[in-house]
Amino acid sequence: MRESKSDRSSARGEPVRLRVIEAAERLLRQDKAEFSMRELAAEAGVSFATPFNQFGSKAAIMHAISARRVELMDARFRKAAPPGDAPDRMLVAVDTAASVMLEEPVVNRSVMGWIGTASPAPGTALARSEAFWSLALAAGDGLAPAARKQALLTLPRQLAFGFRGVLSFWTAGELADDDLAAHAREMAMAILLGVVDGQRQSNGNPAQQEPE
């Protein structure tokens, strides 16, 4: 199949987009969340127009950084290939997501602050987050059979909402770094509680217990 002109342009533009994203991350690490697009262009070693041409706005760059974080969560979860059923995997996914956010708290707090505000065009953070939680749920083993079909349709979005809520308090400084994972786990267990297989709960599965 012949490669289209737009495909070739996209392939050529990807290294430039990456340079801009990485430059933005470097500025954020220096606690320069209010950097200008001119400062960003200088840091990336590109023309002033390039960040606009590649992304359109600063908000879009922040969304791109956020997307990279979710991609990292996804890759690490897949690599871990955790055993157990859906609730077990969900807690591993929560821990994975929290650990990614805590690796660069200064950068990620700044990004969360940006993507939580209105932007010229809607982002894809919700869709990406839903996809990550869907990955952990898989076929829903360990969920109540009668509720499983509906749960698989609704849980990914509810977990996306819940995790974003926990992150919002962390971003605002109301949750310490050391508390992020524990509160995120509590959120996930509360959401799952109503749809977990009753037999599983009666067996005292570790996923329903507090982490040590």
Segments predicted by a language model, with ranges:
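Amphipathic alpha-helical segments that line or abut small-molecule/effector binding pockets
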Residues: E22, A67, P87-L102, L153, ...
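C-terminal peripheral helix-coil segments that are non-catalytic and often amphipathic
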Residues: M1-S4, L135-G142, S168, A172-E212
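Short hydrophobic clusters on alpha-helical segments that form packing/core surfaces
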Residues: V20-L28, M73, A97, F163
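Alpha-helical DNA-contacting segments of helix-turn-helix folds
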Residues: L28, I61-R69, V111, I115, ...
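Amphipathic alpha-helical packing segments from all-alpha helical-bundle domains
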Residues: A118-P145, K149-R164, A182-L192
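Hydrophobic alpha-helical connector segments
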Residues: A64, R78-V106, T117, R128
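Short hydrophobic/aromatic patch on the recognition helix
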Residues: G45-F55
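Basic, helix-initiating cap at the start of DNA-binding domains
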Residues: M1-E43, A60-H63
